[in-house]
């Protein structure tokens, strides 16, 4: 049996991933499909945590630019991530995977508060944990949430599951047919090149805590499992210097 490359991962999903072809809102069949992909990996014995963005329901930055108070806009976005987390948790439960939602803002009626020790215990017991409501403070992205929670739970890697994007390029491949895809980068290279994989805070956190980052196409069935079992798909960002350097 092939040994997995990673035994504990944090999967970062964009909110748009839950919207399907609609692009906005939540498409339940799409969520159920993603849940089945995650279940297949979970059934291989991998410990899994999730962070889901809220962009399918709310965008804080344009609301702020339109005149809304930035702090209030960000808190609204955090609530959007909770909605997405609850929907995904329900889909995973129906797929037969014991799942817990933990929020950085207290809302005991719908989710557990984020407690690191409890999250670790859930993972050790084979439960999936979904971290929602960001870090509980405005001005921090769900990318930063992913890097912070991955460090706290000592994840081996953050899997950046993208919609239709199969890795990191030196230019936008949709606009430049000659754009070059990177198979591997270091965190420092990402920061120096200004590649917009995550925001700089999240990239620095990942680098400082030696957490691999894998960017891959979520829309191709089986890709989550392929990444975890070490197949070369997408782009892997590590703290180590590439052999080609």
Curated annotation (Swiss-Prot):
It catalyses: UMP + ATP = UDP + ADP. Pathway: Pyrimidine metabolism; CTP biosynthesis via de novo pathway; UDP from UMP (UMPK route): step 1/1. UMP binds at residues 54, 74, 135-142. GO terms for biological process: 'de novo' CTP biosynthetic process; UDP biosynthetic process. GO terms for molecular function: ATP binding; UMP kinase activity. The keyword Transferase applies. Disulfide bonds: none annotated. Transmembrane segments: none annotated. ATP binds at residues 12-15, 55, 59, 163, 169, 172. GO terms for cellular component: cytoplasm. Keywords: Allosteric enzyme, ATP-binding, Cytoplasm, Kinase, Nucleotide-binding, Pyrimidine biosynthesis, Transferase. Its main location: cytoplasm. It is found in: Cytoplasm. Allosterically activated by GTP. Inhibited by UTP. It is an enzyme of class 2 (transferase). Residues 20-25 are annotated as: Involved in allosteric activation by GTP. Its EC number is 2.7.4.22. Belongs to the UMP kinase family. Catalyzes the reversible phosphorylation of UMP to UDP. NCBIfam families: pyrH_bact. Homohexamer. PANTHER family: URIDYLATE KINASE, URIDYLATE KINASE PUMPKIN, CHLOROPLASTIC. This is Uridylate kinase. It comes from Streptococcus mutans serotype c (strain ATCC 700610 / UA159).
